[in-house]
Amino acid sequence: MLIPFLFKLTLPLASGIALSSCGTLPEADLGTAAGNQTSSEPTNSVEIVQANQPEIKAVPVIDGLEHPWGMAWLPNGDILITERPGRLRIVRDGVLDPEAIAGVVAVSTVSAQQLFASQQGGLLDIALHPRFAENRFVYFTYSHGTQQANRTRVARAVFDGEKLTDWQVIFEVGQTKPGGQHFGSRLTWLPDETLLVSIGDGGNPPVELEGDFIRQQAQNRASHLGKIIRINDDGTVPADNPFRNDPKAAPEVWSYGHRNIQGLAYDPVTQKVWATEHGSRGGDELNLIQKGKNYGWPVVSFSKEYSTDQPVAPATSRPDMVDPLQIWTPAIAPSGLTIYNGDRHPEWQGTIFAGGLVDRGIRHLRLDENNQIIDETTISIGQRVRDVRQGPDGHVYVLTDQNNGQLLRLES
């Protein structure tokens, strides 16, 4: 029997560097802690007092998911959910179908032609085409290749309600990399039916590419690594991409200088794009994404090296690079992001819900008209939070990244 959880709300900083209660190993995405770490940066903490804060509870919808990663709602209210090991599941009328949806690319850790499901890699995000009712297109991100040479891919397929057909790769990262780290892989649509895709920087030291640590590719505009890319629904390059006509840049690049974005959301009310990004041993970020901008990694960062605990970068800010709006040290390992615009919870209108793997909860942030954070609370889930999304019914839904992962619904 699934029992509703009651969530504890803690009240950290109104602005500046938010302090959570956990640290990370090199793979914060895997959710193992390496002891608490404290920030060396100054903070201006203030106590936030919230009157009449409604109690928030998580109502379990289903369990029995193996490391779920992303979710998307069909027009009839059914939910498609990806599982990182390589399966696509469906929830029909609130019940998880015991059989996986057929038609997903096959899984292998040795064949370069199949889905690579190891460490952080596997079947990752999912998004329906904005005109799904007409074309039945479903989009996926996944890792492809082998332990020695792999990359992020974007594919689309046709879903007829029972199975996938016509699996077609429409984009792949131009360089292969070794290891199983930092695939990025969040998807979000813009109103013009172009698709934003986050691509990770490829991994932590000692992983190298082209004679240097692979993370340096985040500053190389000719590389897809460490970027947000923007493509048309068929994988072609939009005419107004910022570097389309730059011979020294990959034409798909939309923004760069990212480490590993696993929270990406478009706010239709403000027409802004938001992202949450994993740091290294702290320095997790919330960013407002702008076309063509440089977000600094690894040239500027609040992160520290896993091996030495020394700063990754010589500076935390530069005038030619975009500063984050929020920094979390110790790390929360952010994954999953939504900006609430539903009618069911008017008190949440315009607020941000950012999931955390190591944090085992959700950061709930309120902003002023200048996009400055004026309030942040922690909703403690007690499980690794992989994805957070607003459903068509106006509820906020949560996927927990566990062997027996759950789909939860937030209510107040």
Curated annotation (Swiss-Prot):
It comes from the Bacteria. The keyword Translocase does not apply. The keyword Secreted does not apply. Its cofactor is pyrroloquinoline quinone. It holds the Pfam family GSDH. GO terms for molecular function: oxidoreductase activity. One of its GO terms (cellular component) is outer membrane-bounded periplasmic space. Keywords: Oxidoreductase, PQQ. Belongs to the PQQ oxidoreductase GdhB family. This is Uncharacterized protein slr1608.
